[in-house]
Amino acid sequence: MAKSIPSSGAGAVRIILKNKDAFHFDLREKKEDNGKQSYLFDVYYENTTGTLNVLMDNGEPVIAALNLSLGKVITLSNDTNLKKICNYVVDKVNA
C-alpha cells in the first residue's frame, strides 16, 4: 500500500512521484490551439481525488495546476516537481 497524502497536502507531488503505481488518471478533455495542447484529467491517489490541468507547448508544461480534494492547489510556481507529473501523465496518454 502506498503512502497516503497528509490532510494538509504537504509533499503531495513528491509522494505521488514515489508511488506512481498508486496514481491513476482519466483524460476528461483534450484541446489543441496554435500548436499548444490543453489537457484536463481526473486524478486519483490513495486517499484523495482531484483534477490536473496542463497546458503543453513544444512538449513542455507551461501552465499546470493539480487541484486536490484536500483543499490544496499545487501549481508549477509553488512546486517545480509538478512538471514531472505532467510529463508522466501526458506521455502515458499519448503513448
Where are these predicted regions, by residue range?
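Negatively charged, low-complexity tracts enriched in Asp/Glu with abundant Ser/Thr
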Residues: 1-43
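Mixed-charge, Lys/Arg-enriched low-complexity segments
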Residues: 2-12, 64-95
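Low-complexity, intrinsically disordered/propeptide-like segments
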Residues: 20, 26-30, 55-58, 69-71, ...
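Short, flexible helical or helix-coil boundary motifs
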Residues: 20, 24, 48, 92-93
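Acidic, low-complexity, intrinsically disordered interaction modules
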Residues: 31-73
